């Protein structure tokens, strides 16, 4: 974005929203951060706590406010809504968060009609679709956090397994941010070497079942964190920061954000995590990467899961 000051508003000051504000502040990505929450005192407390540390980072104004204070935001990040409790899946939250979004999105659009909307609340793929419909924005300006975090978890676990720097592990998790997501093994490599060849020629210590075990660990990662600490915050905040960074710096980075499919992969009219080129206008391109036949089948099945659940709410 070719402008001096970047204004980012965060709707929701819970664990994810407040940690996201901290991550953005630490990276120096905004000149102004506005935090909005139904619990105004909580939002004020978060803004105060963050503001007390601004002497240690690049100059930034951090305030708690109402929707009118978000006016002319460049990016609006929506983290508000009910989070999953232990034993719940993300899809269990559909109806509760749909009702919450009906109150949020029109207010955001009213004050920032040219903004890019970044949805983080769960179930993120469905709520991104809801935001797209409620906002009337073009699809490239309505983005979900998608499987950006899942992909990071996958890379981390593969790096741990192969005892290699995670930055040299290249792969994607695609589809729903949830239980029907798929691991794109056909695209997975370590410094250009397929995991099969790496295992056979270099690692030579694999127990053989990692291709089943690791994707399950990725799927269950959030649930395990929930069981232990009651919520997730740090990793998702860093994932959101990465998406925002790609937008603000017009990086043309490829990230597995939740994007609207219009026939790609034989899938129509659903948001899901797909490799997409991200820059200052939002989603610049949706990439159709070559998947195995089985992965294509699983991706379509993931889309069907999302469509079945989307049909539970009266969105038009």
Swiss-Prot record:
One of its GO terms (cellular component) is cytoplasm. One of its GO terms (molecular function) is L-lactate dehydrogenase activity. Beta-D-fructose 1,6-bisphosphate binds at residues 155, 170. SUPFAM superfamilies: LDH C-terminal domain-like, NAD(P)-binding Rossmann-fold domains. NCBIfam families: L-LDH-NAD (TIGR01771), PRK00066.1 (NF000824), PRK06223.1 (NF004863). Belongs to the LDH/MDH superfamily. LDH family. This is L-lactate dehydrogenase.
């Amino acid at each position: 974005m070719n402008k001096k000051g970047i204004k980012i508003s965060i709707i929701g000051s819970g664990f994810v929203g407040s940690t996201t504000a901290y991550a953005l502040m630490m990276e120096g990505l905004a000149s102004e951060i506005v935090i909005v929450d139904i619990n105004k005192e909580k939002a004020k407390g978060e803004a105060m706590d963050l503001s007390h540390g601004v002497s240690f980072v690049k100059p930034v104004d951090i305030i708690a406010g109402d929707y009118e204070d978000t006016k002319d935001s460049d990016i609006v990040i929506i983290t508000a809504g009910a989070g999953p409790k232990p034993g719940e899946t993300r899809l269990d939250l559909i109806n509760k968060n749909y009702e919450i979004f009906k109150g949020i999105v029109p207010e955001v659009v009213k004050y920032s009609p040219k903004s890019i909307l970044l949805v983080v609340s769960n179930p993120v793929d469905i709520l991104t679709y809801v935001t797209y419909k409620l906002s009337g924005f073009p699809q490239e300006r309505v983005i979900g956090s998608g499987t950006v975090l899942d992909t990071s978890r996958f890379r981390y676990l593969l790096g741990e397994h192969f005892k290699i720097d995670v930055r040299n592990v290249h792969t994607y998790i695609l589809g729903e941010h949830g239980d029907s997501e798929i691991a794109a093994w056909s695209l997975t490599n370590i410094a250009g070497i397929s995991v099969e060849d790496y295992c056979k020629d270099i690692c030579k210590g694999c127990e053989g079942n990692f291709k089943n075990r690791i994707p399950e660990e990725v799927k269950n990662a959030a649930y395990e964190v929930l069981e232990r600490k009651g919520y997730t915050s740090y990793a998702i905040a860093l994932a959101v920061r990465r998406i925002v960074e790609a937008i603000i710096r017009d990086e043309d980075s490829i990230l597995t954000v939740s994007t609207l499919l219009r026939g790609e992969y034989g899938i129509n009219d659903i948001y899901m995590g797909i490799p997409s080129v991200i820059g200052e206008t939002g989603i610049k391109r949706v990439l159709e990467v070559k998947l195995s036949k089985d992965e294509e089948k699983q991706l379509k099945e993931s889309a069907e899961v999302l469509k079945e659940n989307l049909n539970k709410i009266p969105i038009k």
